[in-house]
């Protein structure tokens, strides 16, 4: 191949070194790169993200970095993650500014079990964008948000904006019904001067307030609410309050910036189409029913700022396969992961003291669970119907096991109590109901007799073996 001009060899060498240095930095190596095969191999080995929503070919390992749409951006073994000196670059998307990952490098290094990390974004112009698709005969929505200040509503069709004024991020203010000239796709843009929250109502008049036909009960509210397909939250939004996106069945994508500090009861309850969520830094609790019945939710990354997972927070998230519970979490409440059929493994972090009633009930695919020493009580039906659970180690800190805690866990080969120095209280003879005939309850050899004679444990005397 002919060259248009001759390049000075010194310039070429300097350029090649610069390229090689950049490749080495991206690849996380200091090795010399042979030309051309070494360059090619190093470039192909660099993990790149899901900018533009492209399909990822990154292989899943232990520490997984996800984009907001669920694309796997980068993945590392635990050893590789411990060796990281910087976090991977964030993906790029038109109209969005990457705010970083919802776990810091320090917090990732402190966690010693598999985990998921999520990308945080804010809109590049600070406006909140609501992407809608209106059907024929359904072109007159009203919009409701909670301004503490003013919110300018640009309907995305070139008409004069509406302005909402309020004094609270939990009190809904409504626009008049807006008349679109034709059905189709529109982007509503909200410009906030002050602060803004989203709110709704799970009662008979309820559901998300964000897009409806009427502020009162009306069957047409469902039609407009379900025209919302994507939301990109901008600056000045601090609260996603009760039922904010309740039963927004068609909502499939949302970006939540790190300025949001509250996600409260029923916030995303019934968002059947949503597939991925990143909980940003600053959020401290996941409230009751927050993601209940999000049937398609396969990926969720929870910031390390979260300390509590409330009642039924993820109940009925049938597609959820993995979740990282941050080290700071001290409470996992009743039904938190009830009917998470696809969940395969869970680590209960140190700091949690009780696994509440039905917390992991009917997690049919759950094969392994790690329980921290801080746990003192396993409550009623905590692991009821966990058919696939293969074995479980009960740490010495557990002093009480409640009724039906491990009922119908047919596949468990052994329960390991070998680290215990005393016999924990067993509240009921139903605790291990359905135990397989060849299952073992492994206890210290010195405690076998005491264990077999203890209240309710005597029912399982034939399963108790000393180790």
Residue map of PLM features:
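Conserved "repeat-terminator" motif of extracellular CCP/Sushi domains
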Residues: 55-67, 91, 107-125, 431
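Structural signature of tandem-repeat unit edges
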Residues: 68, 72-81, 106-109, 129-133, ...
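Extracellular ectodomain segments of secreted/surface proteins
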Residues: 51-58, 122-146, 193-233
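Surface-exposed interfaces of beta-sheet-rich extracellular modules
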Residues: 83-110, 195-199
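Residue-level recognition of secondary-structure-to-loop junctions
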Residues: 168-182, 186
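Short, low-complexity N-terminal tether/leader segments at secretion or assembly junctions of large
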Residues: 1-57, 71
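Extracellular interaction modules
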Residues: 31-41, 82, 103-122, 183-186, ...
